[in-house]
Amino acid sequence: MMIDDFETHAARSSGDLWSEVCSSLPEPREQHGGQFTDSFEPSSPGDPHTDSPRAANFSPWEPMADSEVYIAGLENRLKRIKGQTSEVTSREMLRSLSQAKKECWDRFLHDAQTSELFQEGNFDQSALEQFKRWLSPERVAINAEELEYLLLPTQNSETPASSSQTDKPCVEEEEECPSPEK
């Protein structure tokens, strides 16, 4: 059983108890009248038990060489945890480029002065409108020619006799084939 008779044991100091429990530890240093003497400064390499408040070759505090990198890493980790990452993903980059392209085309298509800058002497207004329509068809209004084409009935519904001609494929390149672009 582990119960000892407490009356037979004499009172021992904490240092004795610790040295008994941890026999591999070095002997405790002698205390100076119970006063606290550690200055939290590194001791000199020649004398590891220096009790002087200032060591002879004391150097002022300097940050470690990699402390800036370490702090930057911690800040990046904190931003990532908060969802404020500063790293640009490919999706964000593509979205940004797409938005810039859209804004640039909007300025080109809707700003008359900018459009005139790209015009040469022989570049007429209809060619510019055609170019704009080719670049961004959903943003340019249809012209009278296109409206007329959309409102006219198709060739197939005009005459039943012509439908037999359109059913056979065009064999030669010189022969005109009906197409929606014409």
From Swiss-Prot:
Residues 1-61, 153-182 are annotated as: Disordered. Regulates clathrin-mediated endocytsois of cargos such as transferrin probably through the association and modulation of adaptor protein complex 2 (AP-2). Has a role in ciliogenesis and is required for proper cephalic and left/right axis development. InterPro entries: CCDC32 (IPR028039). It is found in: Membrane, Coated pit. Residues 153-167 have a biased composition (Polar residues). It comes from Danio rerio. GO terms for biological process: cilium organization; head development; regulation of clathrin-dependent endocytosis. Residues 1-10 have a biased composition (Basic and acidic residues). Associates with adaptor protein complex 2 (AP-2). It comes from the Eukaryota. This is Coiled-coil domain-containing protein 32. Coiled coil: none annotated.
